[in-house]
Amino acid sequence: MSLAVEQVGVRRGGELAIEAVSFELQGGSLTALVGPNGAGKSTLLQAIAGQLPLESGSIQLDGRPLTLTLARRQLALMPQRGEIAWAFPITVRELVGLGRLVAARPGCCDVEAALQRVGLGALAKRRLDQLSGGQQQRALLARTLVQPAQVLLLDEPCAAIDPPARTALLQVMGQLRDAGLTLLVSSHDWGHDLDAYDRVLVLDRQLLADGTPQQVRRALGDLRVGNHRCG
């Protein structure tokens, strides 16, 4: 499923958080949305998911204007890990099952199948507070996968986890891409993980660069985005 963002602006807290952002993603693609903290990455993902109103511009899915109903049917947003109360006394299976309540419609993926897909089948009965950071991120991804969505919006899924966990998560995302899903993944990491993506969008309130990881590195050179050196 294709996703088209055209000249989108979003206001947050009375200020314009992002402005004039345009790009188009095709089905079966894995795209990184990279920028420093405060660049508007989460704001853009939430706007695409229909959780924030647009100040300007438009969003389309497969050529159809995005409505809240369409967003709920075809989009799934994975929140940042810090937004979840991991001390809450429920199991991994129960957390993932909550994704079916968010979707609230037929066609949801089986919880056990989603857990197996992210490599957490053996941990289904484990309590949330017993998970490592990487396991928490995979549990959130599984919760996203039980929703019948064709476009996945993942907010900082690789943040604050160790390299082996990041590698495992990137492998899962690659498998989802290969299965035909469209993934847009936010990150503030300019490291070698970018090479796992088909395409990179660099955002700092506006879109600064768009291309393959190699093209973006060449285009930006030594440019600083926020406090990060891109070269």
Regions from the language model: what does each represent?
Residues 49:
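Helix-to-loop junction immediately C-terminal to a conserved catalytic motif
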Residues 57-70:
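Conserved ABC transporter NBD signature motif
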Residues 108-123:
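Conserved ABC ATPase "signature" region
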Residues 127-131, 135:
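Conserved ABC ATPase signature
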Residues 152-155:
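Catalytic Walker B motif of ABC-type/P-loop ATPase nucleotide-binding domains
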Residues 187-188:
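H-loop/switch region of ABC-family ATPase nucleotide-binding domains
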Residues 199-212:
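H-loop (His-switch) and adjacent beta-strand-loop-beta switch element
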